[in-house]
């Protein structure tokens, strides 16, 4: 199918992108084939009039968990027990897989055309990836890690990560993941905000350096990159010293950390969204304890300072929003761009570039997607207003196109309560 997208204003996704009017985007099946001037012969094309809207690359979310919808719970939940129950029989497995697929679809309806999953239930993420690629499922392109590798008492152990007691068990899980044809490997090196037992100890080191090195060495031998959950300065150093390729979340850096990033050639995937509710919400709203709020502020400040320091020192920065955590819904990745602009001080232009072409490059798919250029996948979105002027334009989409599949007037079901709580932090 040949399509011509007319009467739109192009934003190509490059770092210096500027609005380009009077252009027509031509696609054939799942590929962009040309960008031409108005007035060319469009015989043989289905013409889609964009009515003056802004066409930019589809967003790319590099830190996704498809096992949750972001709805905050009234009380703490035993996620490991819930996953054991889900996997206990075929019926509950089937229901859970359908939910995961529905959450992937919500990402797409929210304008995200590529996701990178970094911890999920069993092999659900690679199955979802393959179903989407085969056209059996409406979802973004998926780069999947399946279950992460954690340790007993470690972050997400037993839910979206497997608890490895020793190096042999960690390597056995890596072999299992490789058999599932994952795209990357995920380690849980430190704890998180809610894992801390005391004030001032978020991001406590959980995984021994020897295990990190053993998994990284074997993963690299097999051709995989390794992403690692790290939320403390100590954890970041252990990760980088032992071969990790991307730091997920991040923490405040010193000169030694900067040197390690550069020597390793690693990048940091900034995630401002998950700590924000714990750090900034009133505890009467979040339900967080004084300890959790205190630790949330440490992590929030660490993530923001990590991104700022990285940008100032030429360390690559990616964006993800840790969707699936409380208050982070599958349709609102656009908020992460707003937070990146607000708290890290980047321009709207740079935020959009980071969430499109830069993310694609850092995820290893920059030759396939991330910018509007011939030969790349037909992955783009259309907004009524200019996101370079206000990133909130990305909230309401006129059109989503993923691998050539057109979704007009996408309208994801929204959690109005969560949206209302988060909206003040966009100002």
Task: List the predicted regions and their residue ranges.
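Active-site microenvironment of metallo-dependent hydrolases
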Residues: 1-23, 28-29, 36-38, 86-88, ...
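Divalent metal-coordination and catalytic microenvironments
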Residues: 8, 25, 30, 52, ...
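Active-site metal-binding motif and surrounding structural segment of the metallo-beta-lactamase
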Residues: 38-56, 91
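Metal-associated gating/positioning segment near the N- to mid-region
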Residues: 54-131
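N-terminal small/glycine-rich loop or linker at the start of catalytic domains
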Residues: 63-85, 143-159, 212-213, 281-283
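Histidine/acidic-residue-rich, glycine-tolerant segments that coordinate divalent metal ions
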Residues: 115-238, 246
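Active-site core of metal-dependent hydrolases
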Residues: 191-304, 318-325, 345-346, 360-363
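His/Asp/Glu-enriched, well-ordered alpha-helical/loop segment
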Residues: 221, 225, 291, 301-386
């Amino acid at each position: 199918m040949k399509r011509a997208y007319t009467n739109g204003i192009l934003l190509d996704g490059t770092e210096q992108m500027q609005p380009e009017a009077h252009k027509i985007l031509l696609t054939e099946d799942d590929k962009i084939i040309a960008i031409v001037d108005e007035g060319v012969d469009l015989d043989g094309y289905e013409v889609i009039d964009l009515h003056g809207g802004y066409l930019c690359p589809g967003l790319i979310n590099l830190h996704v968990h498809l096992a949750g919808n972001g709805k905050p719970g009234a009380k703490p939940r035993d996620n490991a027990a819930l996953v054991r129950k889900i996997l206990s029989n075929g019926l509950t497995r089937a229901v859970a897989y359908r939910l995961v697929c529905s959450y992937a679809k919500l990402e797409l309806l929210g304008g995200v055309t590529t996701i990178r999953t970094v911890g999920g239930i069993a092999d659900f993420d690679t199955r979802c990836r393959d179903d989407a690629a085969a056209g059996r499922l409406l979802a973004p392109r998926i780069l999947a890690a399946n279950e992460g590798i954690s340790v007993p008492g470690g972050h997400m152990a037993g839910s979206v990560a497997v608890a490895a007691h020793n190096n042999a068990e960690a390597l056995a899980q890596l072999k299992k993941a490789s058999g599932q044809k994952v795209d990357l490997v995920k380690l849980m090196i430190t704890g998180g905000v809610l894992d801390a037992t005391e004030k001032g100890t978020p991001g406590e080191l959980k995984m021994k350096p020897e295990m990190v090195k053993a998994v990284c060495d074997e993963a690299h031998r097999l051709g995989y990159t390794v992403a690692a959950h790290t939320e403390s300065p100590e954890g970041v150093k252990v990760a980088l010293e032992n071969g990790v390729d991307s730091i997920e979340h991040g923490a405040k850096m010193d000169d030694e950390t900067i040197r390690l990033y550069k020597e390793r050639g690693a990048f940091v995937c900034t995630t401002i969204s998950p700590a924000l509710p714990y750090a900034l919400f009133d505890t009467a709203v979040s339900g967080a304890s004084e300890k959790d709020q205190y630790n949330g502020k440490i992590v929030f400040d660490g993530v923001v300072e990590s991104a700022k320091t990285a940008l100032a020192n030429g360390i690559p920065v990616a964006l993800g929003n840790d969707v699936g955590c409380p208050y982070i819904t599958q349709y609102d990745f656009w908020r992460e761009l707003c937070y990146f602009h607000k708290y890290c001080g980047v321009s709207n232009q740079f935020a959009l570039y980071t969430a499109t072409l830069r993310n694609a490059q850092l995820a290893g798919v920059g030759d396939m997607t991330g910018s509007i250029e011939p030969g790349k996948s037909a992955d783009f979105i259309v907004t009524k207003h200019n996101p370079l002027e206000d990133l909130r334009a990305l909230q309401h989409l006129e059109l989503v196109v993923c691998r050539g599949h057109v979704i007009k007037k996408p309208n994801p079901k929204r959690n109005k309560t969560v949206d209302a709580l988060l909206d003040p932090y966009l100002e």
